[in-house]
Curated annotation (Swiss-Prot):
Active site: 275, 349
The protein's name: Probable cytosol aminopeptidase
Organism taxonomic ancestry: Bacteria, Pseudomonadati, Chlamydiota, Chlamydiia, Chlamydiales
Gene: pepA
Protein species of origin: Chlamydia muridarum (strain MoPn / Nigg)
Protein family: Belongs to the peptidase M17 family.
Signal peptide: none
């Protein structure tokens, strides 16, 4: 995928379907953010009477026989002294939708005068590229006649030399290949994206990148490893489970290793603790954690980061069948810890628990970060714009929070309240898999923390239940799967681990 290009010269730019011109907001009036020819000023001067230049505001105009582009969009960037990376990201995501609705395929984007900004050219271009790439995406559909909006095919950013701009753009395009992979997997039918399909995608990545190795465990191997919790969840489905291990060696001589774990419930009916129909209809997205890990590995290998990372995906359906696991029964995980099943709809934490144990036994992790659409309680707490995360290590928490801030993928640290751990007490097992009807996200995280046992490994748990999938377009994300987490984690690993 090559979409974005750089061109230093305004005069030498190629003809395009549309031109995007930047404006600042100055005393509730629009102010030009870059110098343009008088021919263009004549086109938009009347429109400025009703255009303030506020953040994300876009006005669509038509050119004339003296303009190289026949469609012109005035894009507001807000007040120059207040503009942020996230505002730039959202603005260019929004204008991408405007351009696609106008059926534009080629676009020229004029950069504002960067000297007026509080941040670097690189940061501006990175956020511009991320905005364009984020909404230049179509989710899979099954219409007889495809009604999707046309995609932009070439976007040229004017005012930056290719040596600088193209390097940034190639990096963002590699990153978004991973984001798109995550989105496509989450958006596709659960009958297609089975545990075996996730394993096939992992194998495909290992075939594409020499730096990746993959290991797949089937049901027999899962049982041999005594992963009793994953095996229990898988009992009710005719679809075979898989336990997927991806390994990336970017710095072979280093002992530092990050383990990423992604919940891979490819469809969640709730099991015998059956979900209501309205709650079940989007449950193909319950493997978004697994898809996030696969997307990260796609980007990681493409960008060739000098770090070591292992990805673990416990993958299964949570279905109803004659052999389905039952509430009140006790199952023993790979760790040897026993769990009383208080709800078969609290299955995600069970399969993550076995994955954590596997990581501790075989991977010698420096840190473990897991991703899961784990609790509805997190959606109630933080909605769809922010993912909650828990961490047992302040440095890891601080670095993840910075990565989230820099990429616009909002994270909020939640507390691991020790006294709530008692809600997991069981009279007949080491613990229950569900607490009371309060603080559900916290007790879920405390459940996972138990499986670290006495290991001092740094750990973070990202509950992406609200952020992984949106019922409507919310800038800078498209409708449905968002790919949330891929950009944040790549930024985190690139800045804090690539040393």
């Amino acid at each position: 995928m090559v979409l974005l290009y750089s061109q230093a010269s305004w005069d030498k730019r190629s003809k395009a379907d549309a031109l995007v011109l930047p404006f600042w907001m100055k005393n509730v009036k629009a102010q030009e953010a870059a110098v343009v020819d008088e021919d263009y000023k004549l086109v938009y001067q009347n429109a400025l009477q009703n255009f303030s230049g506020k953040k994300g505001e876009a006005v669509f105009l038509f050119g004339n026989d003296k303009t190289k582009e026949q469609k012109i969009v005035l894009l507001g960037l807000g007040k120059s002294e207040e503009v942020s990376g996230t505002a730039i990201l959202d603005a260019y995501a929004h204008v991408t939708t405007v351009l696609r609705k106008a059926k534009c395929k080629t676009v020229n984007i004029l950069l504002p005068t960067i000297s007026q900004l509080r941040f670097s050219v690189e940061e501006f271009l990175t956020n511009l590229a991320a905005g364009v790439l984020s909404l230049n995406y179509n989710y899979p559909t099954y219409h007889k006649v495809d009604a999707s909006l046309p995609l932009l095919e070439k976007v040229t950013v004017l005012g930056i030399v290719p040596k600088v701009g193209d390097k940034i753009f190639r990096k963002e395009e590699s990153l978004f290949e991973g984001v798109y992979l995550t989105r496509d997997l989450v958006n596709t039918n659960a009958d297609e994206v089975t545990p075996e399909k996730l394993a096939a995608v992992a194998k495909g990545l290992a075939g594409e990148f020499a730096s990746l190795d993959v290991k797949i465990l089937d049901r027999k191997a899962i049982l041999k490893e005594k992963m009793g919790l994953l095996a229990a969840v898988a009992k009710g489905s005719a679809v075979e489970p898989r336990f997927i291990v991806l390994d990336y060696q970017g710095k072979p001589k280093s002992k530092d290793r990050t383990v990423l774990i992604g919940k891979g419930v490819t469809f969640d009916s709730g099991g015998l603790d059956l979900k209501p129909g309205k709650a079940m209809i989007t449950m193909k997205e319950d493997m978004a954690g697994a898809a996030t890990v696969l997307g990260i590995f796609s980007a990681l290998a493409s960008l060739e980061l000098p770090i070591n990372v292992t990805g673990i995906i416990p993958a299964t359906e949570n279905a109803i069948g004659s052999a389905a696991y039952k509430m009140g029964d006790v199952y023993v995980g790979m760790s040897g810890l026993s769990v009383e099943i208080g709800s078969t709809d609290a299955e995600g934490r069970l399969i993550l628990a076995d994955a954590i144990t596997y990581a501790l036994k075989y991977c010698a992790p420096t840190r473990i970060i897991d991703f899961a659409t784990l609790t509805g309680a997190m959606v109630v707490s933080l909605g769809e714009a922010v993912a909650g995360f828990f961490a047992n290590n302040d440095v890891l928490a601080r670095d993840l929070a910075e990565a989230a801030s820099e990429t616009g993928e909002a994270l909020w640290r939640m507390p691991l309240v020790e006294k709530y751990d008692r809600a997991l007490h069981s009279d007949i097992a080491d613990m229950k898999n569900i607490g009371s009807n309060r603080a559900g996200s916290i007790t879920a995280a405390l459940f996972l923390q138990r499986f670290l046992e006495d290991n001092p490994v740094a750990w973070a748990h990202l509950d992406i239940a609200g952020t992984a999938y949106h019922e409507k377009e919310e800038l800078p994300y498209p409708k449905y799967a968002t790919g949330f987490g891929v950009r944040c984690l790549i930024y985190y690993m690139n800045k804090f681990l690539s040393k």
